């Protein structure tokens, strides 16, 4: 199981190596997630044109596929980039935003799992349950299920697709179908700011680019997210100032912060 030293090693490696993270992501969060990657020490690129997917995959360190604002051309680009990245051994992280809320979202996410075979999928409880085929309530892109409720679905998804599944919430669950890790930290202000889940996904992608395994990358990315959320909340007066302080916290994050603010353990 990844421990604090592994988490810090990956935080430091992201800062030293500046992995290039390619995000095919949604309009709502492009600026938010690009700034988060920069603050963490990674380098973002947000490109969607299918004509350049093959070229870009040759130079990136990891790939994020985020289905938040889907359209047919973007779906084509996701399949092209995802297949090329998988073939080259580049870690792909899928964010199935709103899976279960519409047929398009659910079907696209399921097809990406089958055809792209991402190394990691990160979603909230409702999204993971929907992707695993469980009956779960989804209200837009917001979760009505926590990690505990989605644990069986997460394990099943990981075993079926040979991937790491991350269920984010007040307590985050990371599993590869056999090993399970719980991450406790963060703050209740985090779901009051748009793009926090999508930010978790890009941080996981940055860490996956430098980590020893997808499981370790997922755990360390989520732990960094939780620690920064806790730090930001101490200075924030509300959601607006939290968003600003969160970026600063990612930039300033230290090993001592991780040790003091995040608990990583088994269920």
Curated annotation (Swiss-Prot):
Quote the Gene3D superfamilies the UniProt record gives. 3.40.1190.20
Which catalysed reactions does the entry list for this protein? 5-(2-hydroxyethyl)-4-methylthiazole + ATP = 4-methyl-5-(2-phosphooxyethyl)-thiazole + ADP + H(+)
Stated EC number for the protein is: 2.7.1.50
What keywords were assigned to this record? ATP-binding, Kinase, Magnesium, Metal-binding, Nucleotide-binding, Thiamine biosynthesis, Transferase
Can you provide one Gene Ontology molecular function annotated for this UniProt record? Answer: ATP binding
Q: Does the keyword Ubl conjugation apply?
A: no
* Disulfide bridge map: none
- Database matches in Pfam families: HK
List the InterPro entries hit by this protein, alphabetically.
Answer: Hyethyz_kinase, Ribokinase-like
Cofactor dependence: Mg(2+)
Provide the top EC class. Answer: transferase
Its UniProt pathway annotation is:
Cofactor biosynthesis; thiamine diphosphate biosynthesis; 4-methyl-5-(2-phosphoethyl)-thiazole from 5-(2-hydroxyethyl)-4-methylthiazole: step 1/1
Its biological purpose is as follows: Catalyzes the phosphorylation of the hydroxyl group of 4-methyl-5-beta-hydroxyethylthiazole (THZ).
**What is stated as this protein's family in its record?**
Belongs to the Thz kinase family.
UniProt-recorded name of the protein: Hydroxyethylthiazole kinase
